[in-house]
Regions:
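Internal maturation/activation junctions in enzymes
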Residues: 1, 117-140, 165-195
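Eukaryote-specific, cytoplasm-facing alpha-helical/coiled-coil scaffolding segments in long proteins
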Residues: 66-70, 148, 182
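N-terminal glycine-/lysine-enriched basic segments
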Residues: 134-153, 160-161
Length: 195
C-alpha cells in the first residue's frame, strides 16, 4: 500500500499546519486535519509494519511522459508503476540466474542472452496489452493509448552469489547499475522500435 503525498502536504507538515481534505469527485474542500499528526501516523506505521509506502505525486507528475492524458493520481499497490486514471499495471521480471554462463574461469553474466531476453520481454508485455480483455472500456482505451509496461529483474542476490560478489560491496552496487542500465537502455530501444 502506498500513500500519495503532495509538496503542499509536506509544507504543512514542516510548518505544523492543517491541510485540506478534498473530495476527489468534486474537488471541494470538505474539512481539514493536522498534517503533522497524519504524517506521524504514516511514519509510525511504516516503521512498525513496513506499510504504507509514500509516493510523492508532484514529483511523479513532473516526470509524467504523457501529461496530455492526465495527471498521475496513484501507483500500483507496491508503488513501482505510476498510473494515470484507468491505466492497468503490466509488469514482468527477468530471472538473472537464467542468464549466467559457466566458463572455465567461473560463472559470468551472458549479456547477449540477457539483451535478447529484454527485447523478447518488451514484446511479450506489449502483446499482453494487446490481447488482454479489460473489465472496463475506460481501462481498455487508456491502457492501449499509453501502452505502459514495467520490466524488472529477480534473482539478483542469487546471481551475485554465483559470481562471487558480496551483496553489500561496491562491486555489487556496480553490477546492479550495469544490469539495470542494460535493462533500461535495451528496453527503451525495443519500445521505440515497436512504436
Amino acid at each position: 500500500l502506498s500513500v500519495g503525498i503532495t509538496e503542499a502536504f509536506m509544507e504543512a507538515v514542516s510548518q505544523d499546519k492543517p491541510y485540506d481534505l478534498v473530495d476527489p469527485a468534486t474537488g471541494r474542500v470538505v474539512g481539514q486535519h493536522s498534517a503533522r499528526a497524519v504524517f506521524d501516523a504514516i511514519v509510525t506505521s511504516a516503521w512498525q509494519t513496513g506499510e504504507p509506502g509514500i509516493i510523492f505525486l508532484d514529483r511523479l507528475n513532473r516526470d509524467n511522459v504523457v501529461p496530455s492524458q492526465g495527471e498521475i493520481e496513484s501507483t500500483n499497490p507496491c508503488g513501482e508503476q505510476p498510473l494515470l486514471p484507468y491505466e492497468s499495471c503490466n509488469l514482468g521480471s527477468i530471472n538473472l540466474v537464467n542468464h549466467l554462463m559457466k566458463t572455465p574461469a567461473g560463472w559470468v553474466l551472458d549479456r547477449a542472452k540477457l539483451e535478447k531476453t529484454i527485447r523478447t520481454a518488451v514484446h511479450f508485455l506489449d502483446n499482453v496489452i494487446e490481447v488482454n480483455q479489460y473489465p472496463l472500456p475506460e481501462i481498455d482505451r487508456m491502457t492501449r493509448s499509453t501502452r505502459k509496461i514495467g520490466l524488472g529483474v529477480m534473482g539478483f542476490a542469487d546471481m551475485l552469489l554465483y559470481l562471487g560478489i558480496p551483496y553489500d560491496s561496491d562491486e555489487g552496487v556496480a553490477m546492479a547499475s550495469q544490469v539495470m542500465e542494460l535493462v533500461q537502455t535495451i528496453g527503451h530501444q525495443e519500445s521505440q522500435r515497436l512504436a
